[in-house]
């Protein structure tokens, strides 16, 4: 499985939990440095950000993907739209949460969000 990380660096412990939850080995982590310029249109920045992951059109469509979205909500929304356009579906998304009472602040894997399954379920409620 290929992890595309648009957020903070994932640790070996995070990846071990991902492998346990998904039942698949992480073959590669693509680290994408994410910074948005408030003075420029966000859609073009999201496009460039996803481009910078360096995947080919075939890879976007055929690799088993897990995405760690940017923390900034507008960036995350646009990155998701861009990814859906390239993959043809909503990718699985990693959700991290703060570890209670950790100093310094630490984060742990909370769950893997299956956005495509959520979308398909929601369509039944139309």
Give, region by region, the residue ranges found by the protein language model.
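Short glycine-rich phosphate-binding loop at a beta-alpha junction
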Residues: 62-71
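Elongated alpha-helical scaffolds
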Residues: 71-79
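Long, low-complexity, Lys/Arg-enriched
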Residues: 1-62, 78-81, 85-126
């Amino acid at each position: 499985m290929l992890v595309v990380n648009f957020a903070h660096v994932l640790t070996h412990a995070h990846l071990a939990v991902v492998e346990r939850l998904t039942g698949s080995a992480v073959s590669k982590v693509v680290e994408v440095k994410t910074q948005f310029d408030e003075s420029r249109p966000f859609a073009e920045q999201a496009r460039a950000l996803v481009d910078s992951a360096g995947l080919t059109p075939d890879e976007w469509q055929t690799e088993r993907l897990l995405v760690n979205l940017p923390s900034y909500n507008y960036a995350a929304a646009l990155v998701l739209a861009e990814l859906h356009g390239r993959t043809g579906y909503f990718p699985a998304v990693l959700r991290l949460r703060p570890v209670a009472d950790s100093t310094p602040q630490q984060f742990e894997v909370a769950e893997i969000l299956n956005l495509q399954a959520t979308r398909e379920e929601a369509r039944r409620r139309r």
